[in-house]
Amino acid sequence: DIAGAERLSIQAESIAPESACTSMQLHLQVSPADFPGNWNAAQVLAGPQLALGANSPYFFGHELWAETRIELFAQATDTRTDELKAQGVRPRVWFGERWISSVFDLFEENVRYFPTLLPEISDEDPLAELAAGGIPRLSELRLHNGTVYRWNRPVYDVANGRPHLRVENRVLPAGPTVVDMVANAAFYYGLLRTISEEDQPLWTKMSFAAAQDNFIGAAQHGMAARLYWPGLGEVTPDELVLRHLLPMADEGLRRWRVAPEVRDRYLGVIEGRAKTGQNGSAWQVATVHALQEQGLDRPAALTEMLRRYCELMHSNAPVHTWDIGR
């Protein structure tokens, strides 16, 4: 049951509708000491990230949220009864509920709140493995963690015999073009570097609930959302990006040693999107509305919109430059 510009209420016998949720996932390998700062920063950024990158306004022919994928994924995998919801049982698709001071906070929440779906037990004794100088694979922890669908998820893994932690950012949809997706990644990684290294971190100046409200508001309204930001109050995404976040993203990419011309190219895409207010979702909605005003019914308008989308996608021109009237 998703209510946006229109409302869609359907019942499914499986999680098959979730297969419509195509995402872009960004990973950052960090040290244990740096993990909480980077995860908290990623949570702060989820709202602005999604407002800029929304690209999923239609589902089953209905105009719903700017990024319908967020609510569709949440509802399609939610098996809680009303009674369990009233008791405070957490959904497995989860934003979280607090800032963290250690990666253990998240793994402890996994155990505390979410029952095991796949009770497979490995033969490994992690403590014995450590005592012998080996690297434990922690198969049970990794399997269980993979059944908790946080929008920013902790990842423990072993690669080439070395253990590491990653922040897995699952906020963004795929598309519309490769250049848009690279720009989204540059914006995210630049801001993550700057915000996570601040002496007075942003997450100490705002409630966790405000970050979650930003995330849901951005999913619902995209570039028309109102986002809370410390020191600014409620602002529109374009104002937040153009006046505050773009310089921070540029500085973060500089710290990552990204060349100035590369920073300019991809952050220029973000700037153009913020100035025009046209992300993938806005273009799709405006195009369908224009086609319907020309006399097409909704199915025909969606079909024609998709044809144009595919054509423009292969051009690799950023979505903020796409023409609506063509």
Model-derived features: positions:
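N-terminal low-complexity, intrinsically disordered segments
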Residues: 1-5
